Amino acid sequence: MSWQQRVDDALTARRATDTLRRRYVVSQGAGRWLVANGRQYLNFSSNDYLGLSQHPQIIRAWQQAATRFGVGSGGSGHISGYSVAHQALEEELAQWLGYPRALLFISGFAANQAVITALMKKNDRIVADRLSHASLLEAANLSPAQLRRFIHNDTQHLSRLLQSPSVGQQLVVTEGVYSMDGDSAPLAEIQHIARRHHAWLLVDDAHGIGVTGDEGRGTCWLRGVKPELLVVTFGKGFGVSGAAVLCSESVADYLLQFARHLVYSTSMPPAQAQALSASLAVIRSDEGGERREKLAALVQRFRAGVNASRFTLLNAHSAIQPLIVGDNSRALRLAEALRQQGCWATAIRPPTVPVGTARLRLTLTQAHEACDIDRLLEVLHGAGE
């Protein structure tokens, strides 16, 4: 088989099963409204949960820092790219979340990959929730460690896997809020089981940080859990981009030596770090609390209004509200029907989610108003298929 044949066959297979991904060009993709092709849509696809991507205080912080530092960091943090803005943000995050250290990464994908590939060795075992993010599972598969996956949120299955003999160390991997189902992990029980088996716990709280818990400290804080490795990302609740790993002093020093994604990548722009500090200040303020309260009320309004006879609504109380429709083509038709009525929603299909669970992944944000939720419900219940 030639290279071209391999490429063509893979694309043909995706088209045949209605799983071919595509990008949409938008003029505005975050906030209450999405603008594409000159038309305005109510935006139910953005991860900008607190509406901070448009916050004037955060925008101003980025602009002022760009004037001071320029638009790029100029190199890896090990060379010349670790600025006072990066240092300040790391210290603020560590203090906020109660960890000795925080290390910044250019993305959540990079942070997850870096931690797992740096820590895990031959004869080690990774025990991950089967619905863990692709960045976590790919890193586990690429590492020399053995990967075992437990049934989603099934702590008994997790315990059985950890009980089986292992020569090396064990790492339990889970998420705070799951990106496709919108539900939360039983973190307290998972941590208890991990400690009983002398395993470390890694929690990716990409969709919980900033949005839940006291001062927005996330799912782990809310559940009274402190994993050895906490990954937080900044493209959701923070409204910007990037990520950080919270850990002990010694683990931070270890990652600075052996995490190749950190050592060999250009640091995020200092202006981005300063904007993230401004975002953190908003998240921790009374305004941040008000934004979280409004979002929670909108989620409750949506869940109360969905017609359960037409859609399968998962037990999710986060900003992520998936409607399971099952068939790939039906999910695509429903997303298109919503767009025709002015609501932008995304159809999620395999391999992102299991076969037979294609869905509309609806995300609600603080930028929405109650009337927007009512309009979404009206369109959903009137959508012809």
Swiss-Prot record:
Residue positions binding pyridoxal 5'-phosphate: 108-109, 179, 207, 233
GO MF entries: 8-amino-7-oxononanoate synthase activity; pyridoxal phosphate binding
Domain of life: Bacteria
Function: Catalyzes the decarboxylative condensation of pimeloyl-[acyl-carrier protein] and L-alanine to produce 8-amino-7-oxononanoate (AON), [acyl-carrier protein], and carbon dioxide.
PROSITE patterns: AA_TRANSFER_CLASS_2 (PS00599)
Cofactor or coenzyme needed: pyridoxal 5'-phosphate
Protein's recorded name: 8-amino-7-oxononanoate synthase
Pathway entry: Cofactor biosynthesis; biotin biosynthesis
Residues reported in the UniProt entry to bind substrate: 21, 133, 352
Family classification: Belongs to the class-II pyridoxal-phosphate-dependent aminotransferase family. BioF subfamily.
Residues that bear N6-(pyridoxal phosphate)lysine: 236
Pfam families recorded: Aminotran_1_2
NCBIfam families: bioF (TIGR00858)
Subunit structure: Homodimer.
Keywords associated with the record: Biotin biosynthesis, Pyridoxal phosphate, Transferase
EC numbers, comma separated: 2.3.1.47
Transferase as UniProt keyword: yes
Disulfide bridge map: none
Any one GO BP annotation for this protein: biotin biosynthetic process
Reaction equation(s) it catalyzes: 6-carboxyhexanoyl-[ACP] + L-alanine + H(+) = (8S)-8-amino-7-oxononanoate + holo-[ACP] + CO2
Species, as recorded: Salmonella paratyphi B (strain ATCC BAA-1250 / SPB7)
